A protein has these predicted regions:
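A short, aromatic/hydrophobic, helix- or strand-capping loop or linear motif
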Residues: 33-42
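A short helix-loop-beta-strand connector motif used in the catalytic cores of GNAT acetyltransferases and
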Residues: 45-56
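Conserved acetyl-CoA-binding loop-helix of GNAT-fold acetyltransferases
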Residues: 83, 89-102
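Conserved beta-strand-loop-alpha-helix junction that forms the acyl-donor binding cleft
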Residues: 85-88, 113-115
Length: 115
């Protein structure tokens, strides 16, 4: 099991190899949970657009979580929050969501969660 050290949550390009690998892991996880018609997975190129803020949580050089907001006119929609099983139970998802909330407030928007 992975153990938490200093966690950094930073704005990143989701196409970088370790982050893209985590997004692919999330895709596999979501595909196993929901039927194709219910899965509205946002691809890496979309996540890299200027209207998306994508964050990765890292510790000791390892990517241990991610999350994004997609900017709309008056709100930001939460996308792609994920913490892999090896890093769960340490509160990382809360930290990632708090960072997304902070970014949303900085932009003067409201936060909305999509499914």
């Amino acid at each position: 099991m992975w153990s938490a050290g200093a966690i950094e949550i930073t704005l990143v390009d989701p196409r970088t190899p370790p982050v893209a690998a985590l997004v692919r892991e999330l895709d596999r996880y979501m595909t196993g949970l929901y039927p194709a018609e219910s899965n509205h997975l946002v691809d890496l190129d979309t996540l890299a657009r200027p209207d998306v803020r994508f964050f990765a949580a890292t510790s000791g050089g390892e990517t241990v979580g991610c999350g994004a907001i997609m900017l709309k006119d008056v709100y930001a929609e939460v996308k792609r929050i994920y913490v892999p099983p090896r890093a769960r139970g340490l509160g990382l998802a809360k930290l990632i969501l708090a960072r997304l909330e902070q970014e949303t407030r900085t932009l003067g928007l409201r936060l909305r969660q999509g499914l």
